[in-house]
């Protein structure tokens, strides 16, 4: 089957530029970011510099100030391009085949495999905190990307998508409800500033129940929509639309529905907009037309595309030598390897990106708390942003939104795994000590962001478009600004100074 994943090179440049600009906007804004632990002693607090968790930069501070910082900027842009290529050519095609093989709907695929793959950097960061850096793997790591993922990435999907996607009520309601439960669970666990092994296991159990819910999503959604439709009009409309589609097309699999309702040419060819497959109508029914995509080493014809192709050739070669291209017929059966290898490369490129961003922030003299809420947060969320925007541009709004919320659920609940390992095996004699100062404010911020997202989608007519993108951007900037003011002590009583200052 042929795959046409990815935007054109011109659009890719635009995406990378916007992602780079977004790195300087206040993001996440709920607590200290990953790799920014708080050291407590008596009644004072201090923030350990995020640079302490990374190797030294290539240049001295003076050399960086004299022009070496330009190299850091170029590496950051190059890593953004590398992440985009991995997601475009390997990660999303493997996800498509996995979803098709398991018969998953768009929203379920987005909330499970897509969320897990794009959130791999956060999980790797947590394990590094357990086994290598010995840093705080508490509240800052769990809640770091919440507001940005919920509102910031949704804004990016709406503003950068070239088509309007119709959203379903049930997937958003399901994921937001589970996320609210996750927030409550974490609130209860870290309220006493200590984490025990059974509490980490409890988070894993909740995530297991969430996966079980997704496995029976079709049956559960029908029951919920039938029961709640009298009091919830949006659920009633969702049920009517699903019944109409199944009655009209005679297919119950949503992935097949998506293929059939995309477009129909005069020659009788059904073709999915994403280019995943071509279906031709014959006397024997639908027959599949297979064709491998062009080689990644084929030079584009346009001059601008050639320039970017040459620049990205080292990354293209590295990926071609290490990761099977499951879009091609020969490697199609190796899609599981493609999925895990692409997630591994996403984690590696994200680590380098965040490392360079940290060194850049140190060179520019940005305070640690502000840098954690801006540069580091945006860097670690680049994979989620790229994957969500790419699928939104293909018209798969449910998959994009489910990935946005599902990534938060994955980050929060699956961090019970490193907690469980640390308390049950690595250091079984003592619980994990975490800092829950400001927990009430954080919980309120998360619940407000969940409510804002659901209401924004509802009042926008359940459409993912530029209007929704603007609304989410305004809401996000407002909450993020308040969070930055809270962290630097302008509002509240939570001023954090740098350790050693």
UniProtKB/Swiss-Prot annotation:
Instruction: Tell me where it mainly resides.
Output: Golgi
Provide the catalytic activity annotation.
Answer: Ca(2+)(out) + K(+)(out) + 4 Na(+)(in) = Ca(2+)(in) + K(+)(in) + 4 Na(+)(out)
- Classify the protein's membrane topology as the record does: Multi-pass membrane protein
Its tissue distribution reads: Highly expressed in melanin-producing cells such as skin and eye compared to other tissues. Strongly overexpressed in melanoma cell lines. Expressed in dental tissues.
- Per the UniProt topology annotation, the Cytoplasmic ranges are 88-111, 158-170, 216-305, 356-362, 422-438, 492-501
Signal peptide (UniProt feature, chain positions)? 1-29
Localization of this protein: Golgi apparatus, trans-Golgi network membrane; Melanosome
Regions of this protein lying in the Extracellular compartment:
30-66, 133-136, 192-194, 327-334, 384-400, 460-470
Top-rank lineage group of the source organism: Eukaryota
- GO MF annotation, one: symporter activity
Segments passing through the bilayer: 67-87, 112-132, 137-157, 171-191, 195-215, 306-326, 335-355, 363-383, 401-421, 439-459, 471-491
Q: Which Pfam families does this one have? A: Na_Ca_ex
GO CC, any one term? melanosome
Q: Which UniProt keywords apply?
A: Antiport, Calcium, Calcium transport, Golgi apparatus, Ion transport, Membrane, Potassium, Potassium transport, Sensory transduction, Signal, Sodium, Sodium transport, Symport, Transmembrane, Transmembrane helix, Transport
The GO annotation for biological process reads:
calcium ion import; melanin biosynthetic process; monoatomic ion transmembrane transport; negative regulation of melanin biosynthetic process
* InterPro entries recorded: K/Na/Ca-exchanger, NaCa_Exmemb, NCX_ion-bd_dom_sf
Q: Which family does it belong to?
A: Belongs to the Ca(2+):cation antiporter (CaCA) (TC 2.A.19) family. SLC24A subfamily.
What's this chain's function?
Calcium, potassium:sodium antiporter that transports 1 Ca(2+) and 1 K(+) to the melanosome in exchange for 4 cytoplasmic Na(+). Involved in pigmentation, possibly by participating in ion transport in melanosomes. Predominant sodium-calcium exchanger in melanocytes.
Q: What is the recorded name of this protein?
A: Sodium/potassium/calcium exchanger 5
Could you tell me the gene encoding this protein?
Slc24a5
